[in-house]
Amino acid sequence: MRVGIGYDVHKLVADRKLIIGGVHIPYEKGLLGHSDADVLLHAIKDAILGAAALGDIGKHFPDTDERYKGANSLELLKEVSNLIKSKGYKIHNLDATIIAQKPKMASHIEQMRANIAAAINVDMDSVNVKATTTEGLGFVGVGEGIAANAIASIIKA
């Protein structure tokens, strides 16, 4: 078994959709980024790539490449899953945490889990997503951004 960790953060700004875990979350702001800025899926992709010692999303999907402008992170997650399969691995388990003061994530968690499980072709019981706040502290606490971290375990297929 191999394990990787991932972390991502994006700034909250006006005039952007808030997409987390492939779910559009109604909110007054969205995350700024080259792609859809799905902070959760970015952390998960980095964790999977790290577990396979295949670098990070910046290497595979650089923000200098116009092909990835506005890209759907669920589609890129499928690409990462296919890449590790081509290297002889399969995803065993994912655990991720969204760190956001607002909006509340609880009502969206199950759909996020379903989206992730479908994208990487695993059962939902292999995917855990949870959310927490920073109790008003730091850039997340004052509503300037949202962060996520993830851990992935992979095994030989």
Swiss-Prot record:
What's the record's note on cofactor binding? Binds 1 divalent metal cation per subunit.
> Which superkingdom?
Bacteria
Quote the record's binding site residues for 4-CDP-2-C-methyl-D-erythritol 2-phosphate: 8-10, 34-35, 56-58, 61-65, 100-106, 132-135, 139
- Catalytic reaction equation(s): 4-CDP-2-C-methyl-D-erythritol 2-phosphate = 2-C-methyl-D-erythritol 2,4-cyclic diphosphate + CMP
Q: In which pathway does it act?
A: Isoprenoid biosynthesis; isopentenyl diphosphate biosynthesis via DXP pathway; isopentenyl diphosphate from 1-deoxy-D-xylulose 5-phosphate: step 4/6
> Which residues take part in binding a divalent metal cation?
D8, H10, H42
Picking any one GO biological process from the record gives: terpenoid biosynthetic process
| Enzyme Commission code | 4.6.1.12
Pfam families membership: YgbB
**GO molecular-function terms, A-Z:** 2-C-methyl-D-erythritol 2,4-cyclodiphosphate synthase activity; metal ion binding
Q: Does the keyword Metal-binding apply?
A: yes
**What function does the entry list?**
Involved in the biosynthesis of isopentenyl diphosphate (IPP) and dimethylallyl diphosphate (DMAPP), two major building blocks of isoprenoid compounds. Catalyzes the conversion of 4-diphosphocytidyl-2-C-methyl-D-erythritol 2-phosphate (CDP-ME2P) to 2-C-methyl-D-erythritol 2,4-cyclodiphosphate (ME-CPP) with a corresponding release of cytidine 5-monophosphate (CMP).
Q: What is this protein called?
A: 2-C-methyl-D-erythritol 2,4-cyclodiphosphate synthase
- UniProt organism field: Alkaliphilus oremlandii (strain OhILAs) (Clostridium oremlandii (strain OhILAs))
